[in-house]
Amino acid sequence: MTMTLRYLLLTAMISAGAGVSASWADSRFGHYVGKFVAEFGGDGRKVKLIEPYGYVDPAGEQWDVPAGYLTDGASVPSALWALYPPFTGAYRSAAVIHDYYCDNKQRSWQDTHKVFYNAMRAADVDENTAKIMYGAVYLFGPRWGPGTAPGQRNAAPKATPEQQEEMVEKLKTFVETENPDLDSLEAHAKRMSSGPIMPLRKDGE
């Protein structure tokens, strides 16, 4: 995706959604705290959170994002952008939470990716879409180990963008035909990533 197209997508998405309340929820998946109010940062490519915003997961753990946080959706793999741009639709609120905790690495990559799924479901993202996005993040999203400093570079995926797109399509087919639970989805992602296209990364495991 070109930077121009990415910019246009972000412009349309924020213009349409800024200030929308996050008070909806399927309580089984937690709930949001505050409102999503955002604007573009000075570089025209990042989104700046204007008001504090947060999410409480099903276990009661709070995932807060402070006002002033800048995000560009980078924690959502680029292979998903054509299908699910990270700042459009109901999953926008979950993408901000996920970006922030991928940046600061306060919690494990496993918990951070799992909260992306639960936060999407709490925002009424349909089950299949949430599973496809979670599976792709599990495959290609950032990973880190204990003690990794905020901002420290993550290992790059070992698949090209074209290979990632191919794997996302296969993941989509698996979710739509098998309706896996999350444990089965993670196991399937591991099998995919241990194949000839992309050996499973060992970083942060």
Predicted region positions:
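Bacterial N-terminal signal peptides that target proteins for export
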Residues: M1-L9
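Extended terminal accessory/targeting regions
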Residues: A22-E205
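C-terminal segment of classical bacterial N-terminal signal peptides
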Residues: A16-A22
